[in-house]
Amino acid sequence: MNLFTGDLHNVVAQIFASAENTYCQIVKEMAVDTVFYKVQDQYHGGNGTYFNFNAENRFSLISKSKGVMYLATTPHTGLKEYYQEYEFIDTEDDLELNCMAEIQAARTIKIIDLAALAPLLKTALGDLMGPKTVYADTQLLAEVLSNYADGMEYLSRHTGKPCIALWSDAADGNGMLKNLSVTPLTEYSHNGMSAKQILKSHLNYKVT
């Protein structure tokens, strides 16, 4: 499947070389202290920051020259992204082991707004968020865009809320992010709601 016409490197270069107001429309700055959320498989020594160089997912780089890390802007979306293929969630097997990492921007992070960029690429935003058959295209896009920004913002296919894909040439992000906390989901709460309540009441999961 080919979502792009022409040489993508040249197309993106022309977009970024165009009028400054175009750049302002597609590039956002995430301020220092912005908080992100990520569910991870275990505690990992209290570390939530890890850029995966071996990932083979939507916005990983084909060259593996940089690792990718996915973050959500709400814990609800972080939970849904992690458990997207689950029908039932087990408290003992899942919630006691899996953890919510809260991570903070340690510096200003420049991200590309995929919703603003897609029309300039003459590509439907929905196609970029399609099934795994589009990964060759989205990974190529990530490869090109990683030369212009720290990451990109896209909308979760599951909640419609913003998610962030970040790239770094260091597994620890080289000072881009700061760990705030890593908490087992059995102990995690946000705005007075436990992770279990969010999963059941807001995300409609069956939690046993």
Describe the predicted segments one by one.
Residues 59-89:
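Extended catalytic/binding region for NAD+/ADP-ribose chemistry, centered on the ART fold
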Residues 2-62, 85-208:
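Active-site and NAD+-binding cores of ADP-ribose-processing enzymes
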